[in-house]
UniProtKB/Swiss-Prot annotation:
It comes from Brucella melitensis biotype 1 (strain ATCC 23456 / CCUG 17765 / NCTC 10094 / 16M). Acts as a chaperone. This is Chaperone protein DnaK. HAMAP family: DnaK. Gene3D superfamilies: 1.20.1270.10, 3.30.420.40, Actin, Chain A, domain 4, Substrate Binding Domain Of DNAk, Chain A, domain 1. The keyword Nucleotide-binding applies. Residues 516-529 have a biased composition (Basic and acidic residues). Residues 516-542, 601-637 are annotated as: Disordered. Keywords: ATP-binding, Chaperone, Nucleotide-binding, Phosphoprotein, Stress response. The lineage of its organism: Bacteria, Pseudomonadati, Pseudomonadota, Alphaproteobacteria, Hyphomicrobiales. Belongs to the heat shock protein 70 family. Induction: By stress conditions e.g. heat shock. InterPro entries: ATPase_NBD, Chaperone_DnaK, Heat_shock_70_CS, HSP70_C_sf, HSP70_peptide-bd_sf, Hsp_70_fam. The modification Phosphothreonine is found at T198. GO terms for molecular function: ATP binding; ATP-dependent protein folding chaperone; unfolded protein binding.
Length: 637
């Protein structure tokens, strides 16, 4: 039975795990690392890179390197958070045909789901390489505070990557699964998850294999990226103060600054001070300029203090919704790379009144939890029950633009809820059902998930028709809505697809594109491998020909030289099949050369053995003489 993999598709890094017996195992990628940068790059040569190779070339290709794209997933182009992000990243964020935020590279537009699919493909390949079999099913994690549009877009990304997404699971819940799988005693825990782009806090009750989420809260635009940006802004300001040069519009310099900021942030988690050194960051008429700035941990903490404090309010809200006080939490589990920052650990300790638990790897625990959930769905992991919640209230717009909730936030999912509404005007023959998600009292202030019309209502005075609206949330947190006229029995049902979102046709096209790209990538890899093999054979044959060319006939020597020339010509092109054929031809004609080398080696060995015997016998004589001499000495003594 094929394995179900667990993927933590993070803003900054991604991780993949699989159940190995009773334990979840994190799988190393081709570069030997347990996490993979969530970065995709398109080079000038139209080559696509994923993970570490993409990150390595970011400085020289800022506009073609896409990072932190998860922050755009499921968002509209006119979203204030997208507007903010546009000024902070070197690549182009553009308006998609459906009104969503997309990205553009080399004149081609991509949806965030497509870019995320490329990252998922890399994780899929990592798992397949380890397992030695094709992987088709996965559990993918998302921030707990993701809305329906963001969850749907993540599921779309999985489909584009060629994966059947068995379950979308919340990141803090996945972390709790990995943390509590082997714990039998009942506990109330809080999972504080501060990653690269998002922040979540969830309160859970765990014990005897039951993981029940009591509440969740968070901020989908707060994470390590914001800490990096804050540090980059400081470095730009300091450099301007020193040199009078503003680096704000220099994309190459900004990319170098971003890398340096990320490195400095990591170093300051274990040391009190670091130095940011970037030679030749820019130049003016007086010559090249270098950036060298010392940064203390205290200074960095003061720069990001408001970001750290922004995590406190969601913690308060989560406790309030769970009906608990901070002192009633037995354990606080830290998840996400940013929780290594000492200041964050201090704030968590101060708020919850206890040392946070650091026994899990914050970068890997979410993927491990996803793998465990995969094991549960496959039947490999027994006696585990996961009860998650919907993070935001769901409802519809009613008379006067009011948001009428049908399902309150932190309701356990899956769930179903119906409510009966009526018409607002006499003889109204149709109603528009507008579905929203959020916590504000007016519908317009919340997130519009989608809308549909129920038509064919018989003429009647206002307030008479009975229209039943039903909300159904599945275990992935994805919403289905139906409206039914009780009088006529007419019904309209939709799976909520955000007013933007990807249509089935869009997804189908992107799946085909992804498959075509995978085929092109495979051909490119085959071509590179064929070239490497061919070049290696040319080099070794030329070397052997120089050494043993006089041992073969003139005709054989010419045939080998001609085959080398033909292969060199083929190497100038990109035709992998032709290169393979010419490599094979050279291998065959150079067999005579190999035979001559073998015979020469045998002859040398034979001569060596004969000489060795003579040397050995003369050596024996010497030893005997020595022995006799020593003997004589002994006798004379």
């Amino acid at each position: 039975m094929a394995k179900v993999i667990g993927i933590d598709m993070g803003t900054t890094n991604s991780c993949v795990a699989v159940m190995d017996g009773k334990n979840a195992k994190v799988i190393e990628n081709a570069e030997g690392a347990r996490t993979t940068p969530s970065i995709i790059a398109f080079t000038d040569g139209d080559e696509r890179l994923a993970g570490q190779p993409a990150k390595r070339q970011a400085v020289t290709n800022p506009e073609g390197t896409l990072f932190a794209v998860k922050r755009l997933i499921g968002r509209r182009y006119d979203d204030p958070m997208v507007t903010k992000d546009k000024d902070l990243v070197p690549y182009k964020i553009v308006k998609g045909d459906n009104g969503d935020a997309w990205v553009e590279v080399h004149g081609k537009k991509y949806s965030p789901s497509q870019i995320s699919a490329m990252i998922l493909q890399k994780m899929k390949e990592t798992a397949e390489s380890y397992l030695g079999e094709t992987v088709t099913q996965a559990v993918i994690t998302v921030p707990a505070y993701f809305n329906d549009a963001q969850r749907q877009a993540t599921k779309d990304a999985g489909k584009i990557a060629g994966l059947e997404v068995l379950r979308i699971i919340n990141e803090p819940t996945a972390a709790a699964l990995a943390y509590g799988l082997d714990k039998s005693e009942g506990k109330t825990i809080a999972v504080y998850d501060l990653g690269g782009g998002t922040f979540d806090v969830s309160v859970l009750e765990i014990g005897d294999g039951v993981f029940e989420v009591k509440s969740t809260n968070g901020d989908t635009f707060l994470g390590g990226e914001d800490f990096d940006i804050r540090l980059v802004e400081y470095l730009v300001a300091e450099f301007k103060k020193e040199s009078g040069i503003d680096l704000k519009n220099d994309k190459l310099a900004l990319q170098r600054l971003k890398e340096a900021a990320e490195k400095a942030k990591i170093e300051l988690s274990s040391s009190q001070q670091t130095e940011i050194n970037l030679p030749f960051i820019t130049a003016d008429q007086t010559g090249p300029k270098h950036l060298a700035i010392k940064l203390s941990r205290a200074k960095f903490e003061s720069l990001v203090d408001d970001l750290v404090q922004r995590t406190v309010e969601p913690c308060k809200a989560a406790l309030k919704d769970a009906g608990l006080k901070a002192g009633e939490i037995d354990e606080v589990v830290l998840v996400g790379g940013m929780t290594r920052m000492p200041k964050i650990q201090e704030v968590v300790k101060a708020f919850f009144g206890k040392e946070p638990h650091k026994g899990v790897n914050p970068d890997e625990v979410v993927a491990m939890g996803a793998a465990i959930q995969g094991g549960v769905l496959q039947g490999d992991v027994k006696d585990v029950l996961l009860l998650d919640v919907t993070p935001l209230s769901l409802g519809i717009e009613t008379l006067g633009g009011v948001f009428t909730r049908l399902i309150e936030r932190n309701t356990t999912i899956p769930t179903k809820k119906s409510q009966t509404f009526s018409t607002a005007e006499d003889n109204q023959s149709a109603v528009t059902i507008r579905v929203f998600q959020g916590e504000r009292e007016m519908a317009a202030d919340n997130k519009l998930l989608g809308q549909f019309d129920l038509v064919g209502i018989p003429p009647a005075p206002r307030g008479v028709p009975q229209i039943e609206v039903t909300f159904d949330i599945d275990a992935n947190g994805i919403v289905n809505v139906s409206a039914k006229d009780k009088g006529t029995g007419k019904e309209h049902q939709i799976r909520i697809q955000a007013s933007g979102g990807l249509s089935d046709a869009d997804i189908e096209k992107m799946v085909k594109d992804a498959e075509a790209n995978a085929e092109a990538d495979k051909k490119r890899r085959e071509s590179v491998e064929a070239k490497n093999q061919a070049e290696s054979l040319v080099h070794s044959t030329e070397k052997s020909l120089a050494e043993y060319g006089d041992k073969v006939s003139a005709d054989d020597k010419k045939a080998i030289e001609d085959a080398i020339a033909a292969l060199k010509t083929s190497l100038e092109g990109e035709d992998a099949e032709d290169i393979k054929a010419k490599t094979q031809a050279l291998a065959e004609v150079s067999m005579k050369l190999g035979q001559a080398m073998y015979e020469a080696a045998q002859a040398a060995e034979g001569a060596g053995a004969e000489g060795g015997e003579q040397a050995s016998s003369s050596k024996d004589d010497v030893v005997d003489a020595d022995y006799e001499e020593i003997d004589d000495n002994k006798k004379s003594s």
